[in-house]
């Protein structure tokens, strides 16, 4: 028979047993497993099915198509506007001015013998033809060419945009009162364009009746 004195318990084992006994005595019933909480158990709930809509992404929009080509209808029926395609005609009395003038106190900037103005008042795109023609002598609604556009956008802040005089009539090319052909980021059915701080080309707008400042220009005298 083995006596109690002959049983040797390692020191760390004895300490561990003492700690367990103390915890069992002092911890409250809920932690020890007593009381009502002890009956609770963790229930694993399977992940519910999440419906993702649409399953497939929508097809990309072809901005080179007209609404009629895209939808089979000449009019785009949207909640707050119904623009009719290709109805724009250049106002008869507003053309490129053949004279020189520069209001050095009021121009926004001057570049390549031209003075550029961002109108202080906002107008519809069509209204910019009249607004620019009446701004100062020799001013007209201007469509920025690729070499001028970066200078225009540098003079805009991050939240500004303004109407520019790049347009098209019917299915024709994008042009301006100065003539030439322009590359435009196109929204089908629109004939009006604007630029903002980060524009690399003029952008056509879906609603030409929105109010924005206009880009006007006049030729500066060489003298």
UniProtKB/Swiss-Prot annotation:
GO molecular function ontology, one term from the record: carbohydrate binding
Protein family (similarity comment): Belongs to the epstein barr virus gp42 family.
Disulfide links within the chain: 99-138, 102-115, 128-214, 132-216, 192-208
Species assigned in the record: Epstein-Barr virus (strain AG876) (HHV-4)
Subcellular locations according to the entry: Virion membrane
Domain C-type lectin: 111-217
InterPro entries: C-type_lectin-like/link_sf (IPR016186), CTDL_fold (IPR016187)
Signal sequence, start to end: none
Entry protein name: Glycoprotein 42
First-listed, main subcellular location of the protein, grouped into a coarse class: virion
UniProt KW NAD keyword: no
